[in-house]
């Protein structure tokens, strides 16, 4: 009896490649081709034919129902991913494990952030995740499994990617599209399998592989989004600042002592009427340094497929994230934050014989980071702390003879220092760049030894890990000047008498470098 037909999936009605069609208890069998078609010759007296494929429920059809063989529909197994857990020595059924193990579906990790660890919060039971910065390139979260379990310096969980230990920065840069399985060991099971390194728990990530006899599938995802602060602190304007300052001094002047007004009525009136921004400055430092929002982009492309021998999965991701810092008009270089990531995953496998399989997996991460030389968190702090009316952010070009460089305003600080804080000058004074590269490669051989004893397998694996790092910081000393007097020329122009204060300025961008690998 010759049986012919096509096997399709219940999910999308598309043909399934590589379905095993066989008669149980015999060597009679066939495999569906690239179009899902099969042909099977069975002897007379055969009662049932079985259809089986990984990820689908096995189906049996009675030979007597010949019409049912023309179009066979397999139903996806709803619990196939939840039932399989990746552990130290391979995969096991979840019900066979007695420890606290959680399997995370990769789809739950797909968030708008470019860092995988930021998606942990509130989605994985037992995992504590805290994000202390929103700065692009430095916004990865710190995370612990069931709290901190050791007293040593390293309190982070053990991270395993395709059988090899990795650092948390590499974990942050694994795109969810490349993840096949994500398992978390949360109790003594981790220590039993991985020794003392597993005392803080273990996260095991396995990347996708190709599939034998599968048509090439190409997936593309393009995203563009807007980032902005969730809340901006309200800051008093210069007039309110001066009036409140004077009021605070007045209420704190002891009885019997004469109250001395710090800000004169003339200065308050001039500031309110915006007579001259250099004589009566009113600096909104936050608006000078920060934008309202920024635009970010990312792209992901992956290709998956395979023939009867070789199968493959290739993934490429590009992330481009920007900060919300402005570029001062006087600056000759970019002072905003920019984080670029180029991530590549290449997995190639081959079924050399019926019992021998080889696999090569390579993960490459190229990270580029540009930022102002001043810490961004400090710049934000300075915008809240700096005096808004003591001096202008910058004086007009030409205010100091024979000086073509930017002339930043300043004044002695309230605590006796030679200069105060000028956030605008600190943003403008330099930039830093950092280039980091990670490469992890694993080569494995799996040998089926069923001919020795059923279920026996041997795996051999070698791995290579490399990190290179290079950083450059360049900065100059701003020219700080204090206004001692000014002249109103009567024609709408002014002459300012400026005096250099603090450390002498310099226009030379001095370098500072560092590298390792």
Question: Language-model segments: which ranges?
Answer:
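Small-side-chain secondary-structure face that scaffolds active or pore-lining regions
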Residues: 319-341, 373, 434-440, 451-517
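Conserved nucleotide-sugar donor-binding subdomain of glycosyltransferases
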Residues: 420-424, 432, 438-440
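Short, surface-exposed loop/turn segments at beta-strand-coil junctions that are enriched for proline
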Residues: 45, 448-450
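Extracellular loop and loop/strand-boundary signature of outer-membrane beta-barrel proteins
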Residues: 286-289, 329-334, 347, 426-432, ...
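Short, small/polar-rich motifs associated with maturation and membrane association
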Residues: 1-345, 357-359
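Flexible glycine-rich, low-complexity coil/linker segments exposed to the extracellular/periplasmic environment
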Residues: 231, 235-286, 386-425, 474-477, ...
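Flexible loop and strand-edge segments within Gram-negative outer membrane beta-barrel domains
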Residues: 229-231, 278-317, 321-324, 335-419, ...
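Outer-membrane beta-barrel pore domains and translocons
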Residues: 221-225, 317-319, 363-365, 446, ...
């Amino acid at each position: 009896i010759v049986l012919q037909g096509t096997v399709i999936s219940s999910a999308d009605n598309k043909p399934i490649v590589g379905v095993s069609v066989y008669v149980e208890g015999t060597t009679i069998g066939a495999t569906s081709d690239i179009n899902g078609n099969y042909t099977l010759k069975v002897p007379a007296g055969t009662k049932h034919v079985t259809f089986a494929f990984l990820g689908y429920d096995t189906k049996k059809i009675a030979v007597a129902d010949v019409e049912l063989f023309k179009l066979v529909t397999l139903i996806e197994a709803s619990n196939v991913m939840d039932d399989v857990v990746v552990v130290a020595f391979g995969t096991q059924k979840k019900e066979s494990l007695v420890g606290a193990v959680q399997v995370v579906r990769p789809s739950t990790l797909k968030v708008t952030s470019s860092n995988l660890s930021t998606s942990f919060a509130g989605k994985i039971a037992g995992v504590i995740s805290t994000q202390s910065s929103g700065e692009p390139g430095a916004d990865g979260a710190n995370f612990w499994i069931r709290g901190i379990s050791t007293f040593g310096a390293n309190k982070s969980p053990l991270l395993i990617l395709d059988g090899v230990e990795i650092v948390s920065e590499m974990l942050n840069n694994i795109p969810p599209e490349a993840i096949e399985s994500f398992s978390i060991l949360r109790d003594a099971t981790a220590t039993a399998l991985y020794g003392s390194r597993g005392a803080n728990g273990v996260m095991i990530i396995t990347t996708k592989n190709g599939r034998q006899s599968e048509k090439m599938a190409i997936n593309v995802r393009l995203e563009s989004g807007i980032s902005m602060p969730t809340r901006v602190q309200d800051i008093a304007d210069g007039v309110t600042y001066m009036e409140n300052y004077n009021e605070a001094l007045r209420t704190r002047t002891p009885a019997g002592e004469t109250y001395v007004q710090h800000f004169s009525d003339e200065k308050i009136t001039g500031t309110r009427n915006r007579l001259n921004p250099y004589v009566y400055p009113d600096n909104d430092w936050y608006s000078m340094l920060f934008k309202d929002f920024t635009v970010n982009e990312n792209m992901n492309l992956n290709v998956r497929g395979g023939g009867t021998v070789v199968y493959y999965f290739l993934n490429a991701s590009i992330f481009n994230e920007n900060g919300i810092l402005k570029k001062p008009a006087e600056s000759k270089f970019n002072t905003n934050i920019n984080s670029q990531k180029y991530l590549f995953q290449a997995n190639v496998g081959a079924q050399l014989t019926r019992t021998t399989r080889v696999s090569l997996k390579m993960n490459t991460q190229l990270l580029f980071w540009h930022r102002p030389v001043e810490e961004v968190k400090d710049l934000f702090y300075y915008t809240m702390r700096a005096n808004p009316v003591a001096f202008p952010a910058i004086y007009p070009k030409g205010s100091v003879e024979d000086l073509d460089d930017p002339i930043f305003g300043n004044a002695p600080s309230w605590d006796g220092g030679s200069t105060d804080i000028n956030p605008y000058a600190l943003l403008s004074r330099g930039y830093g760049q950092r280039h980091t590269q990670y490469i992890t490669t694993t080569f494995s051989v799996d040998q089926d030894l069923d001919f020795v004893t059923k279920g026996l397998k041997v795996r051999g694996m070698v791995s290579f890990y490399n990190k290179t790092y290079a950083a450059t910081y360049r900065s100059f000393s701003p020219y700080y000047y204090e206004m001692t007097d000014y002249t109103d020329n009567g024609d709408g122009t002014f002459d300012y008498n400026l005096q250099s204060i603090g450390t002498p300025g310099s226009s030379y961008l001095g370098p500072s470098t560092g590298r390792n690998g």
